[in-house]
Amino acid sequence: VNTDGAEPLIRLFHVSKQYTRDQRALDDVTLEIARGELVFLTGPSGAGKSTLLRLLFAAEAPTHGQIVIAGRNIHRMRQSGIPLLRRNIGVVFQDFKLLANRTVWDNVAFAMEVVGHPPREIRRRVGIVLRQVGLADKVHTFPDRLSGGEQQRVAIARALVNEPAILLADEPTGNLDPALTFEIMNLLVDVNIRGTTVLVATHDPRLLEAFPRRCIALRDGRITEDGA
C-alpha cells in the first residue's frame, strides 16, 4: 500500500464491468497500487482477475467507474493515446503467444519494431533483456525448440523490451511445473526489484506462500481481501 505520500501509479474508483445483464465480471472495485509494488491478484476462475488486467491494459472499457494510470484517466483519453499508454504496460499471458516462425531474438525485437524504434536501439535493448531473462544463448532458437519455462521467459523479455512502468502477468505460471513456476516467479521479483510495478494474477497458493507480498483477493468480481 502506498506509504510515501506519492501519488499511486494505478487507481481504480468504483469500477464495474458487466458483459450481460446477469454477468458482472467486476463489481464496484476500488483500489490503489503504488509505483514499485509487486501485487498478487488471486481468486478462483471467473473471479475477475483477467478482466481487471484487460481493463488496465485498455483492451476493454469499464461499464462504470474510473481507471487512472500515472495521473491519466485512461478511458477519457483519445483513441490515439491508447497505443502510447500500452507502450508503458507490458503484458504476459499464460499461453506465451509467441510467433512460431520467428526466432527468440525476432520475437522480442518485434515488440520494438512495431512502435518504430531504430535498429541500433532494438539491438541494444533486445540484448539487454535476453541477458536479464537468461536466454542470451538462445537468440537464434525457434519457440518449438524451447521448454515451457524458456518460452515464458521469451514472453517476459518481449513484455519488458520497451521498458514499461507496469508489467501485467495473467497466470504466467499456469502451464508450468513447480520448479519452473518458482523460476519464473523469481524472474518477476527481479523485474520488480529493478523498478517495474508488477501485477500477477494467479490461483496458485504455492506462489503466495513462497513470495509473501500484497495480495488482493477477488470473488464474484468483488475484492474480498487486500493485504500482505
Model regions: which residues?
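Conserved catalytic motifs of ABC-family nucleotide-binding domains
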Residues: E163
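Catalytic Walker B motif of ABC-type/P-loop ATPase nucleotide-binding domains
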Residues: L167-D170
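Helix-to-loop junction immediately C-terminal to a conserved catalytic motif
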Residues: F57
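Conserved ABC ATPase signature
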Residues: F142-L146, E150-Q152
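ABC ATPase NBD coupling module
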Residues: T20, I74-G90, P119, V191-I193
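Conserved ABC transporter NBD signature motif
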Residues: G65-N73
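Short coil-to-helix segment of the ABC ATPase nucleotide-binding domain corresponding to the Q-loop/switch region
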Residues: R102-F110
